[in-house]
Amino acid sequence: MQSKFIVIEGLDGAGKSTAISFVRKYLEKNNLAAIYTREPGGTKIAEELRNLVLHNKYDEEIHSDSELLMIYAGRVQHYRNLIAPALEKGINVVSDRFYWSSMAYQGGGRGVELSKIRALNDNFLNGCEPDLVIYLDIDPILGLQRAQKVGSPDRIEKAGLEFFNRTRKVFKDLVKDSDNAIEIDAAKSIQEVEKQIYLILDKHFNFQN
């Protein structure tokens, strides 16, 4: 069976970590080897860039374009050094976020032109597209409330409600325009979200469990 690149997307507080735990449980049950990773981050250099973007300790504003380029520098490291090699070896890759998050957060939220982001993906990631995107949709107010229970808000989580409304809109537009993305209502119970994820994976891997 050809390796798959599966990405979980969604706003902060949508429950991506929980969703990934369900994907892991499913793949392990079916004896499918996989690595689990995240963005921003995923490699040592990419994690350093993540810390700079999310927890800027310097008395210097990060411009929206700079934020995008720092995230993409980390994404190139992540893709070239971890994602692509694993897929070539026949290992499935499950990632908490990929380039859709840049389209939504830096594009929708920050207002960077989406064409610029697509160009980065085409030029530096060979136009890489996940085999499956599971988008967890949640109202930004509920998402931020959930995120605040986990810990102190990071630099992006402090961006404000309108930022997240714009971000959500781009996510939903991306799902509508994609043939390999499925939206799940993340406000539903954990049990219902788990059930839907298993059904999606059954269909994707052609399993009947």
From Swiss-Prot:
Q: Which NCBIfam families match?
A: DTMP_kinase
A Pfam family found in this protein is Thymidylate_kin
Role: Phosphorylation of dTMP to form dTDP in both de novo and salvage pathways of dTTP synthesis.
Catalytic activity, reaction form: dTMP + ATP = dTDP + ADP
Which Gene3D superfamilies does this one have? Answer: P-loop containing nucleotide triphosphate hydrolases
Protein's recorded name: Thymidylate kinase
Extract the CDD domains matched here. TMPK (cd01672)
Q: Which GO terms describe its molecular function?
A: ATP binding; dTMP kinase activity
Spell out the SUPFAM superfamilies in the cross-references: P-loop containing nucleoside triphosphate hydrolases
Q: Where does ATP bind?
A: G10, L11, D12, G13, A14, G15, K16, S17
Q: Which UniProt keywords apply?
A: ATP-binding, Kinase, Nucleotide biosynthesis, Nucleotide-binding, Transferase
HAMAP family xref list = Thymidylate_kinase
> What PANTHER family does the entry give?
THYMIDYLATE KINASE, UMP-CMP KINASE 2, MITOCHONDRIAL
Q: What class of enzyme is it?
A: transferase
Protein's GO biological process: dTDP biosynthetic process; dTTP biosynthetic process; dUDP biosynthetic process
Similarity comment: family membership: Belongs to the thymidylate kinase family.
Instruction: Say which species the protein is native to.
Output: Francisella tularensis subsp. tularensis (strain SCHU S4 / Schu 4)
Q: From which domain of life does this come? A: Bacteria
